[in-house]
């Protein structure tokens, strides 16, 4: 009985610690490499979460050669909220990236939408809301 309980606890812990990276379905919608070839800006969608589930669009900036992390987002406080859509990425030059998008402006999203990354890796990120 003790062995059964320990095995059950271990299984619950392992299942609870499974990586979202392995279980999420990510679709890369747009990828643009910076003019100097050092960075990649990506617009993507992500779905997962099992029975409760989630689906969202967001943007990511990473160094060339790095794997994209779908939770390392440039838009929003809560990364799995469906707050943004129609996301476009465009390099203005080596150190300036423009992200344009539509956002959900309902009161429930006000706090979430107030968080937007303005700089990463020395690249200035310019946000253009298209509503």
Residues of each region from the PLM?
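Positively charged n-region of N-terminal signal peptides that target proteins for export
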Residues: 1-4
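N-terminal export/targeting and maturation segments
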Residues: 17-68
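Acidic, small-residue rich beta-repeat scaffolds with periodic aromatic anchors
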Residues: 18, 76-131
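Mature extracytoplasmic domains of secretory-pathway proteins
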Residues: 47-98
């Amino acid at each position: 009985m003790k062995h059964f309980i320990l095995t059950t606890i271990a299984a619950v812990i392992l299942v609870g610690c499974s990586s979202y990276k392995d279980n999420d379905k990510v679709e890369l919608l747009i990828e643009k490499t910076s003019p100097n070839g050092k960075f990649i800006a990506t617009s993507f969608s992500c779905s997962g979460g099992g029975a409760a589930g989630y689906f969202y669009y967001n943007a990511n900036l990473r160094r060339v050669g790095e794997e994209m992390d779908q939770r390392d987002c440039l838009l929003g406080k809560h990364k799995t909220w469906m707050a943004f859509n129609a996301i476009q990425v465009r390099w203005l030059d080596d150190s300036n990236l423009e992200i344009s998008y539509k956002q959900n402006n309902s009161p429930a999203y006000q706090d979430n939408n107030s968080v937007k990354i303005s700089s990463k890796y020395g690249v200035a990120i310019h946000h253009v809301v298209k509503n």
